Amino acid sequence: KLMNRCVIASSFGKSFHITGWKIGYAVAPDHLMKEIKKVHQYNVFSVNSVAQACLSEYINHIDVTQLGQFYKQKRDLFAQQLSKSRFQLEVCEGTYFQVADYSAISSASDVDFCKSLTTNHGVAAIPISVFNSDLKDAKKIRFCFAKDDNTLIQAAKILCGI
């Protein structure tokens, strides 16, 4: 029953390291896809057909069954590099985001702390409060580890110095 009511909307961006291409997809039962297509045709006004053609070729040369292990290695590298920092890392699985508690570092709001990280240290993070309907601030932020290893190592080095 549930399968007949499910819609998957996703992006190829992080999985294939092509975030700037802005190419996504939707998967749903036929009766739902028929309705999605009615709306979609009016919401998408420009499609990068060259990027679509490149992706359709590229997707045949990558083993998507290895993506889990690929991102696990990235997560483990980033976590290991941050092990001597004052950030408290939360367990993360099935994602390319690492949530970190920064309460041992600052009492600033998560929004202000993220602004400071970007402005003063050149490391981007997203405040978790923006995902909460009540904007509750638990002094937690998230980092994306869908980056090349050198970027992760450099970012962790900066974060360890905070």
Range-by-range predicted roles:
Residues 52, 56, 71-79, 89-102, ...:
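Conserved glycine-rich beta-strand-loop-beta hairpin in the small C-terminal domain of fold type I
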Residues 10, 97-101, 144-145:
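Short beta-strand segments
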Residues 29-30, 60, 101-103, 146-148:
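Residue-level recognition of strand-loop junctions within catalytic nucleotide-signaling folds
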Residues 12-13, 87, 128-132:
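Short, solvent-exposed loop/turn elements at beta->coil junctions and helix N-caps
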Residues 6, 87, 123:
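Short, conserved active-site loop motifs that form the nucleotide-linked donor/cofactor pocket
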Residues 116-125, 131-162:
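PLP-dependent enzyme catalytic core of the Aspartate aminotransferase-like
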